[in-house]
Amino acid sequence: MGTRSYRPYTPSTRQVTVSDFAEITKTEPEKSLTTSKHRAKGRNNTGRITSRRRGGGHKQLYRIIDFKRDKHNIPAKVAAIEYDPNRNARIALLYYQDGEKRYILHPNGLKVGTIIISGPESPFEDGNALPLSRIPLGTSVHNVEMTPGKGGQIVRAAGASAQVVAKEGDYVTLKLPSGEVRLIRRDCYATIGQVGNTDARNLSAGKAGRNRWKGRRPKVRGSVMNPVDHPHGGGEGRAPIGRSGPVTPWGKPTLGAKTRNRKKLSSKFIVRRRRKSSKRGRGGRES
């Protein structure tokens, strides 16, 4: 897997980088493992916009991914590595010995023809799924469960991996990609290795159109809106926001203000909060 760039024969191709798709071995999805996808366009069940700047984009078939890895002690052969339009990571098609087919997230370095397995007695190899209690310290894992049997919920993005740093009692301590250190129950499953397509973070859209293909609409700055639409709006010309700090369209402090509920029950499992990420836009004022 790598990236490919173009000669600057148009302004957009000067900046664009795309994946070379070298690891893809099959172009058409397994029909029995696909389903239609409801496109909410950022709306909730009442039709109100709850996630701004969503809509349009290319129609996509959803690939049914096995995040649970609950088919224990049955070997599976990696039959193909495929592109998935619903995520940055690639997916691997598995053929189990009993005839069943499933998709999983493609671990980095996993080749077609490799035999993988899940279960508490599985060998310690990339792509195998084991309980956290059976995974050695210092190991990189992905697709980590937060509740036993619920399926992997965290560390699923392209190139992501968490590290097992400690074990004590009923819990295993993981260092997540965000920098957060968190306790997870020892009987939760995780997959050995790092998620593939590690170069996804290095890709550049190059033009607005590629973002529109993905259903991402333009982001309008609050300072160019009217006062009825945003607290930063209004004024003559390029006016300052008129506040001590930037706020959301609903008046809540943003760009650094903590939003996590202090009474959230899962807070007791967080050993160290994630590191601060810079989300400031142009001039550090917009939301």
Curated annotation (Swiss-Prot):
Any Gene Ontology biological process: translation
Gene Ontology MF annotations: rRNA binding; structural constituent of ribosome; transferase activity
SMART domains hit by this protein: Ribosomal_L2, Ribosomal_L2_C
GO cellular component: large ribosomal subunit
InterPro entries: NA-bd_OB-fold, Rib_uL2_dom2, Ribosomal_uL2, Ribosomal_uL2_bac/org-type, Ribosomal_uL2_C, Ribosomal_uL2_CS, Ribosomal_uL2_dom3, Ribosomal_uL2_RNA-bd_dom
Composition-biased stretches (Basic residues): 209-220, 259-287
A Pfam cross-reference name: Ribosomal_L2_C
Lineage: superkingdom: Bacteria
UniProt entry keywords in alphabetical sequence: Ribonucleoprotein, Ribosomal protein, RNA-binding, rRNA-binding
Region (Disordered): 25-57, 203-287
Annotated signal sequence range: none
Transmembrane segments: none
Protein function: One of the primary rRNA binding proteins. Required for association of the 30S and 50S subunits to form the 70S ribosome, for tRNA binding and peptide bond formation. It has been suggested to have peptidyltransferase activity; this is somewhat controversial. Makes several contacts with the 16S rRNA in the 70S ribosome.
Family: Belongs to the universal ribosomal protein uL2 family.
Subunit and interaction comment: Part of the 50S ribosomal subunit. Forms a bridge to the 30S subunit in the 70S ribosome.
NCBIfam families: rplB_bact
Protein name per UniProt: Large ribosomal subunit protein uL2
